[in-house]
Amino acid sequence: MQLNVNDAQAIEVSELTFGGEFNETLVHQAVVAYMAGGRQGSKQQKTRSDVSGGGKRPWRQKGTGRARAGTIRSPIWRGGGTTFAARPQDHSQKLNKKMYRAAMRSILAELVRTDRLVVVQDFAVETPKTKDLLGKLNNMSLTDVLIVSDAVDQNLYLAARNLPHVDVRDVQGSDPVSLIAYDKVLITVSAVKKFEELLG
């Protein structure tokens, strides 16, 4: 299949990578797995046994007229432990490489189908100036955009760093969430070829 390039002639690309069906279920699974993998999972609270103190019972079992109490660190008491205390856990979900690649292909194909993929021969800024990059993007009518190139140019990265709706990634650093999150994905021809190598 052919992919239109903004500032040059159309290029021939793999039908497998850029022309497949959109598998919403698989993409959803990939996004959930990616976001779950980013969770820290270090939340921890104290149960009644973790809270300091509470070894000796506050009063004897019988004869006081009060309700029986075995420890001052019971969850019922102020200063006591938590009933179902959170424990550190691993939230990551297993996703096979084959499934991940298929999800990425599905996302790229959907970007092409919905005209959200803007292909350019090359994209760079001469100086690390936000104003220069903003001017370039405005000329292309791009406001909410992910810029994907074969390798991240330092000037481009620095120029985009202060723009809230612009991000710069290389092909290896692209993920399902970032590709979906932006209105448009600006991608260089070399990055397209790299995606074909990795996902083909």
Swiss-Prot record:
Region of interest called Disordered, as start-end residue ranges on this chain: 38-72
Biological process terms in GO annotation: translation
One GO CC annotation: ribosome
Keyword terms of this UniProt record: Ribonucleoprotein, Ribosomal protein, RNA-binding, rRNA-binding
Listed InterPro entries: Ribosomal_uL4 (IPR002136), Ribosomal_uL4-like (IPR013005), Ribosomal_uL4_dom_sf (IPR023574)
GO molecular function list: rRNA binding; structural constituent of ribosome
Pfam family, one: Ribosomal_L4
Keyword RNA-binding included in the entry's annotation: yes
Keyword Ribosomal protein: yes
Superkingdom of origin organism: Bacteria
Protein role: One of the primary rRNA binding proteins, this protein initially binds near the 5'-end of the 23S rRNA. It is important during the early stages of 50S assembly. It makes multiple contacts with different domains of the 23S rRNA in the assembled 50S subunit and ribosome.
Xref: HAMAP family: Ribosomal_uL4_B
Family: Belongs to the universal ribosomal protein uL4 family.
Quaternary context: Part of the 50S ribosomal subunit.
Protein name: Large ribosomal subunit protein uL4
Species the sequence originates in: Pseudomonas fluorescens (strain ATCC BAA-477 / NRRL B-23932 / Pf-5)
Lineage: Bacteria, Pseudomonadati, Pseudomonadota, Gammaproteobacteria, Pseudomonadales
